[in-house]
């Protein structure tokens, strides 16, 4: 499925084109036949371009499959100048991502859950706040390097550039979940053609995700 969106003045995305074609070259979210996948992508893109009345040159693509993994991590740094800056946030995120992952996996997302300043919990926007110690709790999502490369290769063979690779259920959450739902607690379940993707949100952030290689 290919979807074309137009960004409105108020920051909302309006869908102006949709294209679809059976995904013959994918099995349970993973490319198993490059030629068939390329053909399916081309057909879906052509339909979306025709409906939207524009040419597509780059895309954001979703990723799923049983190869996707996730874990919670955290990092701690000293706050420079006693006031949190964007540099401090970057450093603490880097500290949180410094965990060992299998050699065949790559990091897809580092999703902040909350920040703590001098043990004060529940902070989501720490920049400008005072303190001496900054801690970040994050949810890290990884996927097989080869699976991601094959998706990118198929898209590039269609003459398109890949702007970003996004976890399927994370992309779904942007379109169907409200801020209040994520804050109070919600589980999104996306039953697709090859996988069933789920994600649990609480406190405004993702807490857990899973991919089940069984679908509709």
Please annotate each region the language model reported.
Residues 1-5, 196-200:
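Short beta-strand scaffold segments in enzyme catalytic cores
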Residues 3-189, 205-209, 216:
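Nucleotide/phosphate-binding catalytic cleft detector across ATP-hydrolyzing
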Residues 200-202, 210-211:
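Active-site proximal loops enriched in glycine and acidic residues that flank catalytic Cys/His/Asp
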């Amino acid at each position: 499925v290919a979807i074309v969106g137009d960004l409105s003045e108020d920051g909302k995305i309006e869908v102006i084109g949709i294209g679809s074609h059976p995904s013959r070259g994918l099995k349970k979210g993973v490319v198993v036949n490059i030629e068939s996948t390329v053909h399916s992508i081309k057909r879906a893109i052509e339909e979306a371009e025709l409906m939207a009345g524009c040419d597509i040159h780059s895309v954001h693509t979703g990723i799923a499959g049983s190869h996707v993994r996730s874990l919670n991590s955290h990092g701690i740094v000293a706050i420079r100048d006693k006031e949190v800056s964007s540099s401090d946030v970057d450093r603490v995120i880097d500290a949180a991502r410094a965990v060992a992952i299998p050699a065949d996996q790559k990091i897809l997302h580092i999703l902040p859950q909350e920040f703590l300043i001098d043990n004060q919990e529940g902070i989501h926007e720490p920049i400008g706040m005072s303190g001496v110690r900054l801690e970040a709790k994050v949810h890290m999502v990884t996927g097989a390097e080869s699976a991601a490369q094959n998706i990118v290769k198929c898209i590039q063979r269609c003459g398109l550039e890949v702007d970003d690779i996004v976890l399927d259920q994370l992309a779904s959450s942007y379109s169907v979940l409200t801020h209040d739902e994520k804050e109070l607690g919600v589980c999104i379940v996306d039953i697709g053609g090859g996988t069933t993707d789920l994600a649990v949100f609480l406190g405004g952030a993702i807490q857990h995700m899973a991919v089940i290689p069984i679908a509709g």
